Amino acid sequence: MAQWKNLAFLQKEVFFESRAMEEWLIEMRRSIHRIPEPGNKEQKTSSFICKMLEEMDIPHRSYGTAVVGLIEGKEPGRCVALRADMDALPLEEPSDRPYASLHHGYMHACGHDAHM
């Protein structure tokens, strides 16, 4: 039963932390949404991700267009791996929104900009 109380506490913490970062998170997603790139050609996207990781003091390495960040816990034990696709779809974005795709013929139409 105690583990469920801890889970509820954690859910509340995540909720409040994400609310505090909401405007920043929206701007980051929109920034990524503006620069969709085809698979294995995500140069601008991977550079953007590296810049964000640097600003958050998260150690990282680039492998071509792939980026790996390392977030270590305070205690030894189990770990979690998170993965996010960065590629865009070859579609024209029919939008006049200020964060619409700047790359003709490509768009993040499947939510990858939210994954990152």
Regions found by a protein language model. Give the residues of each.
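Acidic/His- and Gly-rich active-site-bordering loop/insert found
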Residues: W4-H108
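DPxDG-like acidic metal-binding loop motif
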Residues: M116
